[in-house]
Amino acid sequence: MASSTGEKGLIVSFGEMLIDFVPTVSGVSLSESPGFLKAPGGAPANVAIAVSRLGGRAAFVGKLGDDDFGHMLAGILRKNGVDDQGINFDEGARTALAFVTLRSDGEREFMFYRNPSADMLLRPDELNLELIRSAKVFHYGSISLITEPCRSAHMKAMEVAKEAGALLSYDPNLREPLWPSPEEARTQIMSIWDKADIIKVSDVELEFLTENKTMDDKTAMSLWHPNLKLLLVTLGEKGCTYFTKKFHGSVETFHVDAVDTTGAGDSFVGALLQQIVDDQSVLEDEARLRKVLRFANACGAITTTKKGAIPALPTDIEALSFLKDQKKRQTNLKFSKWCCTASPC
């Protein structure tokens, strides 16, 4: 774990990093798109960069192809202040690619090229265990559970981090087309469920994992386990709901003109982890937790206003400026309503 010398706690993110190819226009199929924009992505890498841009300490552990794309991605991590000592390069496999279809509302569909890609080939003996042991928070998804040897590397890294005292953060980041079957996806995603201290799922993932279309607290709480400290369900434009052992509630999001929702959930998670890494007592204080989640919602909302994941992740200055503007708008709206009530409008 991080030392108590005043240095910020380290958040280590484990998993995949890839290239997203995002269409230049929304609302068309991949074959109909006139062109694509190249954008770095991969949920765990997105979270690491989100943390760093917000002023936190972040490291990434994973494997990239020993190709132009792989070295480009490693350079992007370094450029954004993310520790890259956990990266390995594979000479025999390519960096993963994903083509993303954008609907008119900014939601996405994916087509992946990873058969196998370098991230799937990370071995347990390639892990930087010293880096993992230094984590105060260890974050991961489920894509690294799909195949060996990466699954074994994932399990080893998670075990080492837990033994070292790290808080474990899990965002399944369901990508159903990558799994052999929906049943296999559920089984493997849930196989490590009770290890995590913090779990974030989307409303789509909640329905998938519970096989229940009813989006209510009872459905969400069916995913609770005794060792869990915080369960979060993100609801897109409806904000998020939160559950702890002592309290639960919801926090509204901010309404923006969404262009691309890629990376919004990762931005949310990165903001949350960056805010709690050095003071985990926030998880037991509802008022403070709500403030943190409002900040995380703001970061997620900002991310949807630009195309691509990593290019859209906000800095701490951008996030605070956004919140300040939102507060000013709310104040002006309240004043306008008061004027109309106090005098003829």
Swiss-Prot record:
EC number: 2.7.1.4
Gene Ontology BP terms: fructose metabolic process; starch biosynthetic process
GO molecular function, one term: ATP binding
A GO CC term assigned to this protein in UniProt: cytosol
Organism superkingdom: Eukaryota
Chain's role: May play an important role in maintaining the flux of carbon towards starch formation.
One Pfam family linked to the record: PfkB
The keyword Transferase appears for this protein: yes
Keyword terms, alphabetized: ATP-binding, Carbohydrate metabolism, Kinase, Nucleotide-binding, Transferase
Family: Belongs to the carbohydrate kinase PfkB family.
Enzyme class label: transferase
Organism placement in taxonomy: Eukaryota, Viridiplantae, Streptophyta, Embryophyta, Tracheophyta
Protein name from the UniProt record: Probable fructokinase-3
CDD domains assigned to the protein according to its UniProt record, in alphabetical order: bac_FRK
Catalytic activity: D-fructose + ATP = D-fructose 6-phosphate + ADP + H(+)
Pathway the protein acts in: Glycan biosynthesis; starch biosynthesis
